[in-house]
Amino acid sequence: MKLTRRHALKLVGASGLALSLPTLGRAQEIEKKNLTIAVGGKALIYYLPLSIAEINGYFDDEGLKVKVADFAGGSKALQAGVGGSADVVSGAFEHTINLQAKGQMYRAFVQQGRAPAIVLAVSNKTMADYKSPADLKGKKIGVTAPGSSTNMMVNFYLEQNGLKPSDVAFIGVGAGAGAVTAMRTGQIDAMANLDPVIGTLLKENEVRVIADTRTVADTKTIFGGNMPSACLYASEEFITKNPNTAQALANAIVRADKWIQANDAETIAKTVPATYLLGDVELYKQCLDANKESLSPNGLVDADGPATALNALAAFVPNLDASKIDISKIYTNEFAENADKKYPNV
């Protein structure tokens, strides 16, 4: 059940954000037209709405000039946002929780994903005899970057199965061809990554999947509820000073969300850059079909999503006191609701 406007206003009212939100249907002056969005792994299906918004000209339609800065992982993109080299981050929802725990107020304002779409797989070369999670102890596990959402998923999985993050060695391998090479050459024994990286390795029977969050059902099994994933987030200061800019960004992403749901894998594969395909268009289309459910249909955060994300994060982040996190301040659905009304169809 999505939040109503009244409920959303209640949630964000304490911060004063609601007072600055754009009014639907009235022309609004864009406060900041030139923007940099940081992302960790732009070619990933996880961030497909960002690419579609850029390729289809949705940012341009909103009067924005957007530069996308691509980094090796979500934690690097986060650093760019906090450091000031990017205005907005296209990253994992749970980063807003981590930031609040450190006294930095950031808010997700439009969703690209409604399930993490992260797959944990073991090597059929170095872990051919894998039988249970206990076999991961002492192994090298590849993640897109230390501290990223892939790292978080592995930590949570380890905790669920009686292991600690310190029981394994994490190695950053990125989210592209380098990750595939790391697995094939034996640099790592297991990997938490996304498609098309995972799909590439599965095609050649090089890995075996042991945990999968590409579907809503599997995500609920692993995390205990809906787990919001890719989003656009920015500092509270940025959103408060630039509400019309935030609305324009949300409009573009919601249009992209809906376009993806309305088009088949063939059309999407022809739309994205050839480099996204990792040399195999048929594989990419298979990955699109496997991940489509994980992508948001409307840019909204599910009602139980923030609490699920907080519980997952609190399970392994040292010294993170969930009772001190105000989840009403880590997201707002107001911009996405406005965008959904402005663009009810593709």
Q: Which sequence ranges carry the predicted segments?
A:
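N-terminal export signals
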Residues: H7-A27
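Solvent-exposed, polar/charged alpha-helical surfaces in well-ordered, non-transmembrane soluble domains
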Residues: G57, Q79, G83, I97, ...
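Secondary-structure end/capping motifs
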Residues: I239-L320
